[in-house]
Amino acid sequence: MKLKETLNLGKTAFPMRAGLPNKEPIWQKEWDQAKLYQRRQELNEGKPHFILHDGPPYANGNIHVGHAMNKISKDIIVRSKSMAGYYAPYIPGWDTHGLPIEQVLAKQGVKRKELDLVEYLNMCRDYALSQVEKQKEDFKRLGVSGDWENPYVTLTPDYEAAQIRVFGEMAKKGYIYRGAKPVYWSWSSESALAEAEIEYHDLVSTSLYYANRVKDGKGVLDTDTYIVVWTTTPFTITASRGLTVGADIDYVVVQPAGESRKFVVASELLNSLSEKFGWADVQVLATYRGQELNHIVTVHPWDTAVDELVILGDHVTTDSGTGIVHTAPGFGEDDYNVGVANDLEVFVTVNERGIMMENAGPDFAGQFYDKVAPTVIEKLGDLLLAQEEISHSYPFDWRTKKPIIWRAVPQWFASVSKFRQEILDEIEKVKFHSEWGKVRLYNMIRDRGDWVISRQRAWGVPLPIFYAEDGTPIMTAETIEHVAQLFEEHGSIVWWKREAKDLLPEGFTHPGSPNGEFTKETDIMDVWFDSGSSWNGVVVNRPELTYPADLYLEGSDQYRGWFNSSLITSVANHGVAPYKQILSQGFALDGKGEKMSKSLGNTIAPSDVEKQFGAEILRLWVTSVDSSNDVRISMDILSQVSETYRKIRNTLRFLIANTSDFNPVEDAVAYEELRSVDKYMTIRFNQLVETIRKAYADFEFLTIYKAIVNFVTVDLSAFYLDFAKDIVYIEAAKSLERRQMQTVFYDVLVKITKLLTPILPHTAEEIWSYLEHEEEEFVQLSELPEAQTFPNQEEILDTWSAFMDFRSQAQKALEEARNEKVIGKSLEAHLTVYPNEVIKTLLEAVNSDVAQLLIVSQLTIAEGPAPEGALVFEDVAFVVEHAQGQVCDRCRRIDTTVQERSYQALVCDHCAEILEENFAQAVSEGFEAN
């Protein structure tokens, strides 16, 4: 037998190298076969519910890193809730209707207008479902646990029927109406857009300053006076029907030198405008408040048959322009509101493709709206005072990336104004994990207009509205429920397969249809109404879920999207918010903090991360960042996270290896019988348990990451395990001192594995497979540990906190000696301490082998003053000398008792005692040379 074989060198097959890219799919397959998700739900039946409702990603293309961050975050929360005693089923979902899928088919060469509509919609459906399957595999590869066999998909018949019933309840309450209000209109999509489908970019536009001649000054202005207007949308002048001034703004009538005309501008802007127009020696003839100009009549700049009325509006400012704006009720929300209030004509001169129509006049008809500025300038003639190109923030279609316009078209609206206060009151009851999120959603609801819910597209859920022969819309409770039942049985495709009369209840009549003829609406619903109905289609309709949901967790862009639409529909139907809590996340940026873009080549695909590092590293990264704000990710950042993972893994591997001969039932030592240092580590670990339990409950992932990394690297690796080798390797295998330490090792190993499970389920299960004494087959079927408290806990913590300070001072002294070449490793040291009374009391309280704790071979606690040249740190003096004696071949300490024993072993007395008591045969036969 060799001497080194008498050491308890921990042995384990648990590999140092994780091999995550290859192992993770194997684990995932095993979990599927074992039906782990279903077994976890069965374990928690009857326990308090926690429902995280999944916001549906759009089914188009592979997932990106933002998807991964969101789904992993949800998975961590659901897993932690399940292990904390909650019934927390997770139903993943997908949003499957809308323009992007139509655009993909168009790029693939599908010509919608050449196909039968039903055939086209089936192609859309097939494509959407193929994308659902693609993304499902992507999400499962991340280790996300959920009811993947029964997800919700917005195109399924049951979901579409639930959506129709949400609409029906809103219609019953009078919240659905038809109007010709201006809406965001995308000429590139040929459809109206919701606010959530708008994004802003800088756009260079031609701005014009021009004048309208006064026709009837109402005794205030003369007819040789011109009111000066500013616009950044020249095409809208074709539909201008009024001029709007601010009631409380001061306006001046001026006459520049050499001009026969008089002009009206805002007093505050006169100087800047005079410079812009080249006016000199401007004479101010009169000053009027805006309200005094109300109802003055002017003439359209070129269509002299059209009068433009001066009206008052709160939206007019003196921040730019002239303090006067022209008003085209067909091309703007503010224009529409003040125009309708003053009986102005709602006139629209642009068609659905952005082309000027015949009613714009022969000079404009057929031109693209954005190209008419030269024609407008020509038509204005000497009424044009100035023109310039300006760059300003402008709304774009978020899908096509093309600018949009405001355009009044007949649309279906969901009222927000009728129950706005009810929505705002519900926001106050929701718990927001960021106060700014609450303010943002509150302000959006407070300031938003009614919701245009109709879309002039094909792929979506039809609006369940019929029309009588006289054009009267029909949407009664009876007709809507009948449509819902048809959708439930056949899917919404039935709307396009059948005639209107075959979609109505049998025998249905209406006074507006004396001949019994009906037509049906051909518009579909805004896709935000689709996903915004998920609280009904999923949370209400699935028996395992409870409404309202406990948590909605999505990106911060969803304050204007899913959070918003879900809130409106839920309050409209039931008077309550669909969620009790909202947690939002920022965006994933590249390593430099730049937005990720395929064109910039700075995107990171989750699949690439999985191939290089494994999904565990992506999961750990999610906890390493504050995702409530924008976060950074790059392969370099992931390499750093991978290194942290390696440290955690190797530390836990050490614990596995050094508890391989430990049976917790037979070998565990009661807390009361532990050494002081072991009690300290037990208490510190339970503080960690408490911190992590609270952080899981509060969704504070970064707190968990920092706490675990700190405990593993500082408390374990840099302290407890650093000196542990001198005990677990060297002491007799069944000695009390070794079993004391193994008791702590095993407790930490089992519980920290459970704590890590929601974040690193693959690694946790791999560790668990080595813990043969644990009852649960899978760690995912266990519970999170509860934090314990212990007698004299604070006193023990105070003692060891003080010792850690002392240890730090001692390490400085050893480092100094190492630099001076007095010693090499710390085990070569004889450390003499000249303590003050506080330290002397402390070392007595520690009641441990201090030399062992400091990893030195010899320690002397000296009396009296320290010699000259001693190293002093914070009133404690140290002298470091090389230890006396020889190196023990077994424990590697330098000791004066080391000698060659009769059994061919150069060992110290302590090791000799262990050998003679535990290895009698080897002692009698003599040890082999190493």
Swiss-Prot record:
Enzyme Commission no: 6.1.1.5
GO cellular component: cytosol
Compartments it resides in: Cytoplasm
Annotated positions binding Zn(2+): 888, 891, 908, 911
Obligatory cofactor(s): Zn(2+)
Motif ('KMSKS' region): 595-599
Binding-site positions, L-isoleucyl-5'-AMP: 554
Broad class of the protein's primary localization: cytoplasm
GO function terms (MF aspect): aminoacyl-tRNA deacylase activity; ATP binding; isoleucine-tRNA ligase activity; tRNA binding; zinc ion binding
Group of enzyme by EC: ligase
UniProt record, GO biological process: isoleucyl-tRNA aminoacylation
Protein biosynthesis keyword on record: yes
Superkingdom of origin: Bacteria
Cofactor stoichiometry and binding remark: Binds 1 zinc ion per subunit.
Catalytic function, reaction form: tRNA(Ile) + L-isoleucine + ATP = L-isoleucyl-tRNA(Ile) + AMP + diphosphate
Residue numbers covered by motif 'HIGH' region: 57-67
Binding residue positions for ATP: 598
Function: Catalyzes the attachment of isoleucine to tRNA(Ile). As IleRS can inadvertently accommodate and process structurally similar amino acids such as valine, to avoid such errors it has two additional distinct tRNA(Ile)-dependent editing activities. One activity is designated as 'pretransfer' editing and involves the hydrolysis of activated Val-AMP. The other activity is designated 'posttransfer' editing and involves deacylation of mischarged Val-tRNA(Ile).
Notes on the domains: IleRS has two distinct active sites: one for aminoacylation and one for editing. The misactivated valine is translocated from the active site to the editing site, which sterically excludes the correctly activated isoleucine. The single editing site contains two valyl binding pockets, one specific for each substrate (Val-AMP or Val-tRNA(Ile)).
Assigned protein family: Belongs to the class-I aminoacyl-tRNA synthetase family. IleS type 1 subfamily.
PANTHER family in the cross-refs: ISOLEUCINE--TRNA LIGASE, MITOCHONDRIAL, SOLEUCYL-TRNA SYNTHETASE
Protein name, UniProt field: Isoleucine--tRNA ligase
Native organism: Streptococcus sanguinis (strain SK36)
